[in-house]
Regions:
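Hydrophobic alpha-helical bundle cores within soluble ligand-binding/oligomerization subdomains
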Residues: 2-172
Length: 172
């Protein structure tokens, strides 16, 4: 049986489910609040709001906590390693040595972009926002790599992720 909290407004009673967060914290699921009551919530700065469920990131700004897949960000500050962090975010764990070597090689091997992509990149004004350029270039990549659009086969995920990440590094 799901635990709930009771909200009473204008003589009506509403049951809102309790959910458990990544770190064991309890939360009230208000996703149906507006539809059922017409009410919204006010939480300045979103200090008491979890915006989504995530298996990737945990943030507690008051406590200064940031974790990726359960690993404190401080671990990556001490030993920053792009390949390890990319693997962790994609696959949910740090890579074994063989996985690291294979993924690292794939990132290097797949870095080249089509010549016309270079022309696209040169066509942007020098004053254009970098993220706007990067977004446009990533969208253009799907014209050359239809496999980026949808990955149905989990066995293909590693190759497609390596190809996309390597090209983003080249563009950036």
């Amino acid at each position: 049986m799901t635990e709930t909290v009771t909200l009473q407004v204008d003589g009506k009673t509403y049951q809102l489910p309790l959910v458990q967060g990544t770190e064991g914290e309890r939360a009230i699921d208000i996703s149906r609040l507006r539809a059922e009551t017409g009410l919204i919530t006010l939480d300045p700065g979103y200090g008491n709001t979890g915006s989504c469920e995530s298996a990737i990131t945990y943030i507690d700004g008051d406590q200064g906590i940031l974790r990726y897949r359960g690993i404190p960000i401080e671990q990556f500050e001490k030993n920053p390693n792009f390949v390890e962090v990319a693997w962790l975010l994609i696959f949910g764990k740090l890579p074994e040595q063989s996985e690291y070597d294979r993924f690292s090689e794939a990132l290097t091997y797949r870095a080249n972009i089509d010549e016309s992509m270079t022309h696209n990149l040169q066509g942007f004004p020098r004053s254009a926002p970098p993220m706007a350029i990067l977004s446009a270039m990533i969208n253009a990549l799907s014209c050359f790599h239809p496999e980026f659009r949808k990955v149905d086969d989990p066995d293909e995920l590693e190759a497609v992720a390596a190809r996309l990440i390597s090209k983003i590094r080249t563009i950036a």
